Amino acid sequence: MTNFGLFVGFGAPVDGRETQAARVFGEAMAYYARLQQQGDIESFDGVLLEAHGGDLNGFMLLRGDPVKLGMVRASEDWVRLVARAEFVARGVGVVSAILDEEAQRLVSANEAMTADLR
């Protein structure tokens, strides 16, 4: 499994656009499934969070090769989907993610790089 991903976070639906938000969520899941089937991403998870007092209601985590993820992120389909999501949900954000063993490697490397600052 790859150690790189895209984190797509989102908040509550915009008032009056709840039905459209559900539709765009479904579009996103279908799009990610197509990307996986085509080999553009390795896998994806759609996550809804329980109420916690914050503004993050859920997220999608796409895993894949960083070069392929960059190509996905630059595609017209991706830009269209993010624009649609921003229209129906608050706080939509897309962030590159470093996962699993690569995250651990970076934490260890940061410890070594900052040891003299302690």
Predicted features along the sequence, with ranges:
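Short S/T/G/P-rich N-terminal loop/turn motif that feeds into the first structured element of a domain
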Residues: 1-55, 64-72, 94-118
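Mid-chain, well-packed structural core segment of small domains
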Residues: 58-90
